[in-house]
């Protein structure tokens, strides 16, 4: 499944990806806790995004995947071409947090019942590696 589905946004993304600098690149390994994995139906979406550690919560880079109910590990790369707003990229931030969220609602907003994991705040280098464990449930606070 693709949120772009042959739209002009998808074409914009492909053109940007081909021509613009991708640095910095964040390599992410996502591990899903066994208790959460047992509740996955295969109808969920996995949102992986990086945002500033303070200030605006707008994703600086984002990717979205279908969740396989038997898959425990995901390997994801985020880079400058995956921003939602042209001047709000990974390279525009001094420090970021990376979050991985599984949702049955398939919406960008975090909802009660979503499963989530996040990194600690980190400074961005030209190459970064992060391990995220999805091991928490979002409550309706």
Per-range role (PLM):
Residues 16-17, 60-67, 86-88, 117-123:
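Beta-strand-rich interaction surfaces with strong enrichment in secreted/lumenal proteins
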Residues 45-51, 97-101:
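Beta-strand signatures of extracellular beta-sandwich domains
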Residues 29-39, 82-85:
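Short amphipathic, basic-aromatic surface patches that mediate peripheral association
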Residues 64-86:
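A beta-strand/beta-hairpin structural motif
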Residues 83-95:
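Short glycine/proline/serine/threonine-rich loop/turn segments at secondary-structure transition edges
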């Amino acid at each position: 499944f693709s949120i772009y589905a042959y739209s002009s946004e998808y074409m914009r993304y492909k053109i940007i990806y081909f021509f613009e600098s991708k640095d910095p690149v964040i390599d992410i390994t996502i591990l899903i806790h066994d208790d959460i994995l047992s509740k996955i139906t295969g109808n969920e979406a996995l949102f992986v995004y990086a945002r500033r550690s303070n200030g605006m919560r707008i994703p600086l880079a984002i990717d979205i995947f279908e969740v396989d109910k038997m898959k425990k590990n995901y390997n994801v790369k985020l880079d400058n071409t995956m921003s939602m707003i042209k001047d709000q990229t990974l390279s525009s931030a001094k420090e970021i947090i990376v979050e991985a969220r599984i949702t049955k609602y398939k919406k960008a907003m975090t909802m009660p019942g979503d499963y989530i994991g996040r990194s600690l705040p980190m400074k961005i280098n030209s190459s970064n590696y992060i391990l995220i464990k999805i091991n928490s449930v979002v409550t309706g606070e």
